[in-house]
């Protein structure tokens, strides 16, 4: 009897260790809230200045002309690098960042467009918000404590775009 209880205790302890280890690599374990540093694309975060973006990537391939936004009460323009990495500035700070092709631009956890959709849940855990459209497109949205959003779009089992929204 005593030996059976000891064996049961060892088994329970081992099972606890295995379940804890399974969650170690998962970023989003606490109420669907990421750390601010987890929300970046290619080293660019919401709030990164225009000068910092240019320091990392140089001059953009294309740039839209700044336009006034009544909703934001500031000027808005977009830098595009290549054809698939977009950084939208409100004033002098990056507010929306998006990549929509397999171009090597990654999150700090190494997730890129073209990766299997399963990588999203494996690394980030349960999303703050999830939706699936009739066409099969799935959207996984995560956020930090400041409501900065990190969104993944997937279709047919693969990530098709990754975006950051400065205020979700």
Language model segments and positions:
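Bacterial N-terminal signal peptides
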Residues: 8-16
């Amino acid at each position: 009897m005593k030996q059976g209880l000891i064996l049961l205790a060892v088994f329970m302890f081992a099972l606890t260790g295995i379940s804890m280890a399974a969650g170690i690599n998962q970023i989003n374990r606490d109420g669907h809230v990421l750390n601010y540093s987890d929300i970046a694309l290619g080293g660019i975060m919401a709030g990164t200045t225009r000068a910092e973006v240019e320091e990392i990537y140089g001059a953009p391939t294309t740039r839209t002309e700044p336009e006034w936004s009544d909703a934001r009460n500031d000027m808005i323009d977009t830098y595009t690098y290549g054809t698939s990495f977009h950084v939208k500035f409100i004033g002098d700070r990056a507010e929306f960042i998006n990549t929509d092709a397999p171009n090597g631009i990654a999150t700090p956890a190494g997730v890129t467009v073209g990766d299997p959709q399963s990588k999203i849940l494996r690394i980030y855990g349960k999303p703050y918000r999830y939706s699936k459209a009739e066409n099969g497109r799935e959207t996984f949205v995560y956020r930090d404590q400041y409501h900065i959003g990190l969104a993944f779009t997937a279709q047919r089992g693969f990530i098709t775009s990754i975006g950051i929204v400065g205020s979700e």
